[in-house]
Amino acid sequence: MSDQEAKPSTEDLGDKKEGEYIKLKVIGQDSSEIHFKVKMTTHLKKLKESYCQRQGVPMNSLRFLFEGQRIADNHTPKELGMEEEDVIEVYQEQTGGHSTV
């Protein structure tokens, strides 16, 4: 019986991991920090939209990076291997420009 009891508790931990929340720091170019608590399985588009709304800027005017890689709207913290207190960097999107060649 103890084996049966242990097995469901392991499964519960697996389920808990799926719905687990982590805190992420979003740091802007001006070094301002906003902290977000997100589920591991939530699409990061929600975090990006919330950040842009707080900053009063359109979402397409900023780019969000985690460990140097651009974050897509459909990425989740779990897919990117994010952990508690990880940092997302935000930069002004640069458009235009010309070749110097």
Swiss-Prot record:
Residues 20-97 form the Ubiquitin-like domain. Residues 98-101 form a propeptide. Covalently attached to KCNB1; UBE2I increases cross-linking with KCNB1 and PIAS1 decreases cross-links with KCNB1. Interacts with SAE2, RANBP2, PIAS1 and PIAS2. Interacts with PRKN. Covalently attached to a number of proteins such as IKFZ1, PML, RANGAP1, HIPK2, SP100, p53, p73-alpha, MDM2, JUN, DNMT3B and TDG. Also interacts with HIF1A, HIPK2, HIPK3, CHD3, EXOSC9, RAD51 and RAD52. Interacts with USP25 (via ts SIM domain); the interaction weakly sumoylates USP25. Interacts with SIMC1, CASP8AP2, RNF111 and SOBP (via SIM domains). Interacts with BHLHE40/DEC1. Interacts with RWDD3. One of its GO terms (cellular component) is nuclear body. The record marks F36 as: Interaction with PIAS2. Cleavage of precursor form by SENP1 or SENP2 is necessary for function. PROSITE patterns: UBIQUITIN_2. Residues 16-25, 37-40 are annotated as: (Microbial infection) Interaction with Tula hantavirus. It holds the Pfam family Rad60-SLD. This is Small ubiquitin-related modifier 1. InterPro entries: Rad60/SUMO-like_dom (IPR022617), SUMO1_Ubl (IPR046332), Ubiquitin-like_dom (IPR000626), Ubiquitin-like_domsf (IPR029071). There is a cross-link at G97 (Glycyl lysine isopeptide (Gly-Lys) (interchain with K-? in acceptor proteins)). GO terms for biological process: cellular response to cadmium ion; cellular response to heat; DNA repair; negative regulation of action potential; negative regulation of delayed rectifier potassium channel activity; negative regulation of DNA binding; negative regulation of DNA-binding transcription factor activity; negative regulation of DNA-templated transcription. The modification N-acetylserine is found at S2. The lineage of its organism: Eukaryota, Metazoa, Chordata, Craniata, Vertebrata. CDD domains: Ubl_SUMO1. It comes from the Eukaryota. Belongs to the ubiquitin family. SUMO subfamily.
